[in-house]
Amino acid sequence: MLLVGTPLCEQLCAQEQPLHELPVRDVDISYQITQPSQRTIVQRRRWLASERVVRMDGPGQSATIFDRNAHEITVLNLANRSYLKLEGTPRLPLDPERGKAPARGSQSVIAGLECVDWTWTEDVETHTVCLTSDGVLLRHVVDGQTLMQARSVSYAAQPPELFRVPQGYEPALAPGGGPGH
């Protein structure tokens, strides 16, 4: 997705190449995630670029599917074969507050790919993301601490069925006791 027509475009559209905020082709990424006061985990994210859908699989018995076109989040419980659908779209890593454009920084090589750092301050936190020219997030740093960094990246077609509720899964109860669609 290009940033044309957004507040970020004022600064970024002047760059020699357009900045993509989401991957523009299918990709499978393994990240090391380090949250303060928590153990480090490995998370797999697979993008179906044509449909703007991402599937995140962590170390537990669940997966989360974010459908940006439908503004829908689906949580799959792999252990009991159930799912919960919620409305919403998560913020993108490169998503500063309105009116705050990120500054272009240095280039890096992470997981064998070149990326460019983009930095901005939000509230009191300084965020830096390193993005490839085709929109793959390779690193996210907040206040000098690396929260997320790619360990491996594989460009390959992703099977669309990975981004759907599997057959045989039942709706889970939503918070408040009602069924998730």
Where are these regions (language model features)?
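N-terminal leader/targeting segments and the immediate start of mature chains
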Residues: 2-53, 157, 161, 165-181
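A generic structural signal for short, solvent-exposed coil/turn residues
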Residues: 6, 21-23, 37-39, 48, ...
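Ser/Thr- (and often Asn-) enriched beta-sheet segments in non-cytosolic proteins
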Residues: 28-34, 40-44, 109, 119-121, ...
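Extended beta-strand-rich segments in extracellular/periplasmic secretory proteins, especially
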Residues: 24, 93-141, 169-172
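Mature soluble domains of exported/periplasmic/lumenal proteins and thiol-rich metal-chelating peptides
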Residues: 27-33, 74, 78-91, 100, ...
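Short, solvent-exposed secondary-structure boundary motifs
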Residues: 30-40, 53-58, 91-99, 117-121
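An acidic-aromatic
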Residues: 43-95, 126-127, 136-153
